[in-house]
Amino acid sequence: MAFDKKLLDIVACPVCKGKLEYDKVAQQLICKADKLAYPITDGIPVLLENRALPLTESV
């Protein structure tokens, strides 16, 4: 199942409530403010702080 980009208009980072960006290749939603990546599993974003991955400096 593919991620529906329309969700970007309504979802927010659970930590800072900021805007998220979609990374199609990595299948993640990115919060640049907190430098966190939230996984997308079967088209569903997993917006749980304890499941977020820290971004590397290259992202």
Curated annotation (Swiss-Prot):
One of its GO terms (cellular component) is cytosol. Pfam families: Trm112p. It comes from the Bacteria. Belongs to the UPF0434 family. HAMAP family: UPF0434. This is UPF0434 protein SO_2800. It comes from Shewanella oneidensis (strain ATCC 700550 / JCM 31522 / CIP 106686 / LMG 19005 / NCIMB 14063 / MR-1).
